[in-house]
Amino acid sequence: MADLKNLFLITKHPSTTQIFLTSLFFLSLFLLSSSSLSDFSPSLIVSSFTSRLLTAANFFSSPSSYTSSASDTTMFLSSVSPRRINEPKIDSETKELASCDIFDGTWVFDDSEPVYLPGYCPFVEDKFNCFKNGRPDSGFLRHRWQPHGCSIPRFDGKKMLKMLRGKRVVFVGDSLNRNMWESLVCSLRSTLEDKNRVSKIIGKQSNLPNEGFYGFRFNDFECSIDFIKSPFLVQESEVVDVYGKRRETLRLDMIQRSMTKIYKNADIVIFNTGHWWTHQKTYEGKGYYQEGNRVYERLEVKEAYTKAIHTWADWVDSNINSTKTRVFFVGYSSSHFRKGAWNSGGQCDGETRPIQNETYTGVYPWMMKVVESVISEMKTPVFYMNITKMTWYRTDGHPSVYRQPADPRGTSPAAGMYQDCSHWCLPGVPDSWNQLLYATLLVSHGSLPDKSLGSLL
């Protein structure tokens, strides 16, 4: 194994592996600090793994950023206790996961059924429901993600629901996060004997806003899986120009205010932002970006994005109670447009298999380099789900022309419509993201008996 000092030394430009392993380390400590330890001490995988890593805390670039926030960090750093003799043993698969970068791997053929069958989950939006919209092939469902250094467990919805008993999971971000949210709801629902025990959360019934908030409650487990629309994470606003005309701006110095009270106290918050920063007005940056009363005449999108991510990070560090809430950030999901962009004739139809060449590498998004740098400087540990590489290869997984039903007149489905080469069919690729989320939660506290899972998250 690599020298732990080198693995966990955060430099000014940390590697993706460093970000991953460091995030996993702190997530493990979070789960221990906020868990009830009256019945179980930390599992072998957590106590042995984290006890080795505790010494690495001395080698972080800014250790004061972790200790200056009063007692929060001290508490979770000191919560790791030795394993008791009568503690359950941990399976070798979970042990293996603890030292593995699960986001570095390849897609392999797998003829097993998806976690939920096409057409069987009523919560999939039509624009992601490729089966309903007439997609004839199913080969894109016959591949699973295989990390290079380990095997990941198959998604077990019953076990995950037990881990989430009494908890709130909130996805905050753009429609790619909504893609992942719908996938998780459907994956969990598929394991229920009584599918009617899932209820839609309605704003008027729960004192929640009707616009931009969506949620489902798993009644028998008293847990909810919610989505909040916040494509930039920062506040969309408007100003009145010198001619008295209102125009949209994006407040780079202000988190989206209307929704933060909903998720700041959630148990798990999963953020993302990326694709909306590639649209024309954000990319051009003319008279659109605002800080305080200043509207920039022109601002490069990279600088604007960096300011926005710092605003998000500052809000998280100031408002999230890290002994209660675990924070995730989902990386940039690859698009695969040919011959144009989403609004200029770009295409991806006809793709039925992933790219098989393992040496293929897409262009690593500059946005993720910004996110990685900012996360490395935060005092709140953030688990970074770097899904960029695993989506590079999946040219076959997009709705393309099957983002809506074919014309009943028999016209070609591609005629007169733009193709969706950014989002993903469901079931499909986002199910693998949630499999990695599930694996992460398993590693962070070990595979203890089912009866104890609910109290350990």
UniProtKB/Swiss-Prot annotation:
The keyword Ribosomal protein does not apply. GO terms for molecular function: O-acetyltransferase activity. It comes from the Eukaryota. Pfam families: PC-Esterase, PMR5N. A motif (DCXHWCLPGXXDXWN motif) lies at residues 420-434. The chain crosses the membrane at residues 19-37. Keywords: Membrane, Signal-anchor, Transmembrane, Transmembrane helix. A motif (GDS motif) lies at residues 173-175. Its main location: membrane. It is found in: Membrane. GO terms for cellular component: membrane. It is a single-pass membrane protein. Belongs to the PC-esterase family. TBL subfamily. Contains 2 motifs that are conserved in esterases, but it is unlikely that this protein belongs to the catalytically active pectin esterases. May act as a bridging protein that binds pectin and other cell wall polysaccharides. Probably involved in maintaining esterification of pectins. May be involved in the specific O-acetylation of cell wall polymers. This is Protein trichome birefringence-like 4. It comes from Arabidopsis thaliana (Mouse-ear cress). The gene is TBL4.
